[in-house]
C-alpha cells in the first residue's frame, strides 16, 4: 500500500521490490569471476571507429567489434532551454527507538520538508515495524549535498518518529533530461541504461 502524505491507496496485485545494491554488486562480481571478465577503472577518453571500435582510455587502448556505453551523459553539449535537472537523493536506513510503523505501507511523497529552491520530499520504505529507509529526494538543478540531507532527515525523523539509530546510508543521482541521448556515437557503440534514455518513467 502507498501513502501520499495523508492519502492511502492499495497497489495490489503489484508489488514493491527493494534490491540492495551491495547484493547486486556481489552477484555481478561472481559472474565476472566465473567467465574470466576483467574490470578496469580507467577514464574513457575517445570511442571511435565503424567496423572495429577503438576505445582509448587515459592509460590504454582497446579494440572491439562492439562497445556498450553506460557513461553519464555530457549535459554541457545540450542546448540551453532543454529540460535539464537531476534527481538527487540521500537516505538513512534507521531503527526507530520509540514509534512503530505499519510495515505494509510505504510513504511515497511527504513534502513537510524545506524546499530549498527545488522540489523536495521524503519517502519511507519500511522493512519492519521499527526499521525503514527514510530518504530525502530533490528534483532541481542544484544537487542535494550530504550535509543538507543529514540535517533535514534528522529534523524530520525526530519530529515524526522520535529517537532513532542509523544502520546504513545510501545516496545517488539520476539525471532527468528531455534531450535525445544520441551523442554521435559510432554505429557499433550501443548506449545503455540512463545514457540510452532508459530511466524508468515512474522515476
For the regions a protein language model found, what residue spans apply to each?
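Conserved mid-domain beta->alpha element of the FAD-binding
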Residues: 179-203
Amino acid at each position: 500500500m502507498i501513502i501520499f502524505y495523508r492519502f492511502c491507496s492499495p497497489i495490489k496485485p503489484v508489488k514493491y521490490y527493494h534490491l540492495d545494491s551491495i547484493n547486486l554488486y556481489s552477484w555481478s562480481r561472481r559472474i565476472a569471476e566465473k567467465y574470466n571478465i576483467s574490470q578496469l577503472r580507467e577514464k574513457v577518453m575517445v570511442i571511435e571507429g565503424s567496423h572495429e571500435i577503438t576505445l582509448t582510455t587515459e592509460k590504454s587502448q582497446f579494440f572491439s567489434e562492439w562497445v556498450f556505453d553506460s557513461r553519464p551523459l555530457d549535459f554541457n553539449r545540450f542546448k540551453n532551454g532543454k529540460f535539464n535537472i537531476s534527481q538527487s537523493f540521500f537516505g538513512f536506513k534507521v531503527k526507530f527507538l520509540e514509534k512503530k510503523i505499519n510495515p505494509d505501507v510505504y510513504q511515497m511523497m511527504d513534502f513537510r520538508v524545506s524546499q530549498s529552491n527545488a522540489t523536495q520530499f521524503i519517502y519511507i520504505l519500511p522493512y519492519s515495524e521499527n526499521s525503514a529507509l527514510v530518504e530525502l529526494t530533490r528534483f532541481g538543478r542544484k544537487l542535494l549535498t550530504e550535509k543538507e540531507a543529514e540535517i533535514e532527515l534528522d529534523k524530520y525523523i525526530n519530529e515524526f518518529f522520535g529517537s532513532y539509530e542509523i544502520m546504513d546510508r545510501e545516496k545517488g543521482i539520476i539525471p532527468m533530461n528531455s534531450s535525445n541521448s544520441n551523442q554521435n556515437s559510432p554505429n557499433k557503440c550501443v548506449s545503455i541504461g540512463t545514457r540510452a534514455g532508459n530511466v524508468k518513467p515512474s522515476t
